[in-house]
């Protein structure tokens, strides 16, 4: 398969970015998207050789394309590319590393950009600084407990419905696709998931109201936008986190402001 790639290149957060165009050929339909970028980078490194398959249409930058990745199994949340106007590309419920080239047509033009958000400054090319999400977790995304022996798993009975909802919320991998998809660059789905997976369980209910208040305040402080209920975040989330977590966060936030315990 042959593709024309339009890739965002930017030296740092303060530099002016631009698209560069590459023609890449003979890509297997079974390649993942990141493997295709690996092949591109190999050819960028060796493009001066006579047998290079890479055609560079406008390329003042010679270093390989920088992009985040780690596990390449859809678990770590490191990979995050805006592909043809969609976070993680043109499929549902997957991360970028799980996107395969067979989802495209031979000869397609593919536009590849980093996450766009004030809270996610560009480090280089397609790599952005998502440490703002970690700072939100540090503000309150935990439970306070006394260290010591580990209690038995069945010490505190938990209804299956609550356990299932908590598990669904806990599947958030913190990739930032919800922020990238949102026209306001809001992190409400991320914060809602992190608040919900603790508040739904007995161990997390004690600090539920204070947790919601701290995490929302930190989110606003870091420059994320407000939620206007378009739910693009839910549509693009690779782990299919539901918007009900946003509703639960709003409810706990209001209860915290009123000084009431979250239910």
Model regions: which residues?
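Residues in well-ordered beta-strands of folded domains
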Residues: 6-8, 25, 98-100, 111-115
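Eukaryote-biased recognition of intrinsically disordered, low-complexity regulatory segments
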Residues: 1-23
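Ferredoxin-type iron-sulfur electron-transfer modules in oxidoreductases and energy-metabolism complexes
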Residues: 31-51, 55-63, 110-263
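Short, structured protein-protein interaction patches enriched in aromatics and acidic/basic residues
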Residues: 57, 61, 65-78
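Functionalized membrane-embedded alpha-helices
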Residues: 75, 81-83, 233
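Short, contiguous acidic and Ser/Thr-rich linear segments
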Residues: 20-32
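Glycine-rich phosphate/adenylate-binding loop and adjacent beta-alpha elements
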Residues: 83-107, 112
